[in-house]
From Swiss-Prot:
The keyword Nucleotidyltransferase does not apply. It comes from the Bacteria. Pfam families: PrmA (PF06325). It comes from Streptococcus pneumoniae (strain CGSP14). GO terms for molecular function: protein-lysine N-methyltransferase activity. This is Ribosomal protein L11 methyltransferase.
Length: 316
């Protein structure tokens, strides 16, 4: 019987995507996230300031490796890669542990994390192996969580989806920066966007996004490519959405302003509480006006507008 190894990494919440991506690059066959925030409150409303809730500052990233992989080498490589990034972000004190799993335990462990989840009024995320019958008006996003990048239920993704549902009216061009799983591109298509261009610096993410897009019929209007933020992009967009780290978002805002059409939107998420002011100042310096600010626990998301009429600005 084939066995698997479960490698658990405890890290500060802000490092979730970074550590997940590193583990996949180091050969993980899948990654699961345990976050206390995932179990707090399932009813969210666009534009509402969410109350602070009791939560842990750390999350657990669990990676799965076949027994043919020497996880001690993975641990050493992970530590080395992260040590190169300590000037970029504080991931806290890394805690790493491993456990052996039988094949059937691997399958069960995967599936216990993932169930169909209604995220917004219209959008429901469904694991690819699940038979799910949509109700009238319900739009289904099929994802394979076994390819990592989360299930689409993380607060940063949920707020991004709420924002897309609010601003998309049909016929728009959307740029999805740091696409990851491709969930925001798929949602944009379901919500009526005419054409979506998805970019990610990580070749693994580009592949994962394309595979997830292919799980959903009628997604021929999504184009996925490797790209460093919006460098070299010359496509005018009605909406730009980016769910990535705050330290990276601030390098996006000038190019976003250049590419967003008048009265268009910039949606940003993935912003940890302590870095909200930095991101807001960057967007406003580029010329955007804040329309909506969302908060869920430690995480912030926002909708900025490129407009000359600021009379309807809500502020944060």
């Amino acid at each position: 019987m084939e066995t698997w190894q479960e490698l658990k990494v405890t890290v500060k919440r802000e490092g979730e995507e970074l550590v997940s991506n590193l583990l996949i690059e180091l050969g993980a066959q899948g990654v699961a996230i345990e976050d206390s925030m995932d179990y707090v409150g399932n009813v969210d409303r666009f534009g509402e300031i969410f109350p602070e809730v009791e939560q842990q500052e750390e999350i657990v990233v669990t990676a799965y490796y076949p027994d043919t992989v020497d996880v001690t080498v993975v641990e050493a490589d992970l530590q080395a890669r992260i040590s190169e990034l300590t000037d970029f972000m504080d991931l806290g004190e890394l805690k790493i542990g491993t456990t052996a799993l039988a094949e059937e335990d691997w399958a069960d462990n995967w599936k216990k994390y993932y169930e169909p989840a209604r995220i917004t009024h219209d959008l429901t995320i469904v694991p690819s192996w699940t038979d799910y019958e949509a109700t009238a008006g319900e739009k289904i996003i099929k994802l394979d969580p076994g390819m990592a990048f989360g299930t689409g239920t993380h607060p940063t993704t949920k707020m991004s989806l709420f924002a897309l549902e609010q601003v998309l009216r049909g016929g728009e061009t959307v740029l999805d920066v740091g696409t990851g799983s491709g969930v925001l591109s798929i949602a944009s298509s379901l919500l009526g966007a005419k054409e979506i261009f998805a970019y990610d610096l990580d070749d693994v993410a580009v592949r994962v996004a394309q595979e997830n897009i292919e799980l959903n019929p009628g997604m021929e209007n999504i184009h996925v490519a490797a790209g460093d933020l919006l460098k070299g992009v010359e496509i005018e967009a009605d909406v730009i959405v980016a769910n990535i780290l705050a330290d990276i978002l601030i390098h996006l805002t000038d190019d976003a302003y250049r590419l967003v059409k008048d009265e268009g939107y910039l949606i940003m998420s993935g912003i940890i509480k302590d870095k909200w002011d930095m991101v807001r100042e960057s967007a406003e310096s580029a010329g955007f006006f804040l329309e909506t600010h969302m908060v869920q626990g430690e995480w912030n998301a926002c909708v900025f507008k490129k407009t000359k009429d600021i009379s309807g600005v809500i502020g944060g």
